[in-house]
């Protein structure tokens, strides 16, 4: 007799939710990378025009090398100043291709537009909210002895507020109520929302 082939196991809905969360996070990373690349270099234009040559020699006291122990041109090939090689980099010679201030920044976005796009992505991420009616502490032997119809005593009394939790963290308290539009379902009326500060 041939063995029966089992039907393929379907992925639970949990994996689908994880895939949606991963996609939302990847989309957020893409927006952050794109947003960061658009702003790169925008602060360089505010530094001032590059038409004036930089004077690094004034930082060292002298531009002829005397502050470092002598004339370097004479020690290394001498007469370089006569051949024009000592001219170095002339910022006005057009070497850099023009003025950086004159070039418009392509793809400049309005300030804060990246933040609103990021917030839209974040606001679409689903989270699980749990309502904790109460807890109970028991020994393993008591847990193993439970049968159908057994009652477990909770640490809260009737009418006490329940805890509202997100990711294992209490974010508020509320009271259990019956939904107005559907008397077969429960809801929670918020009594207190905890602040983010600890």
UniProtKB/Swiss-Prot annotation:
Its main location: membrane. It is found in: Cell inner membrane; Bacterial flagellum basal body. Disulfide bonds: none annotated. It is a peripheral membrane protein. The keyword Translocase does not apply. Keywords: Bacterial flagellum, Cell inner membrane, Cell membrane, Chemotaxis, Flagellar rotation, Membrane. GO terms for biological process: bacterial-type flagellum-dependent cell motility; chemotaxis. It comes from the Bacteria. GO terms for molecular function: cytoskeletal motor activity. Transmembrane segments: none annotated. InterPro entries: FliN, FliN-like_C, FliN/MopA/SpaO, FliN_T3SS_HrcQb, SpoA-like_sf. One of its GO terms (cellular component) is bacterial-type flagellum basal body. FliN is one of three proteins (FliG, FliN, FliM) that form the rotor-mounted switch complex (C ring), located at the base of the basal body. This complex interacts with the CheY and CheZ chemotaxis proteins, in addition to contacting components of the motor that determine the direction of flagellar rotation. NCBIfam families: fliN. Belongs to the FliN/MopA/SpaO family. This is Flagellar motor switch protein FliN.
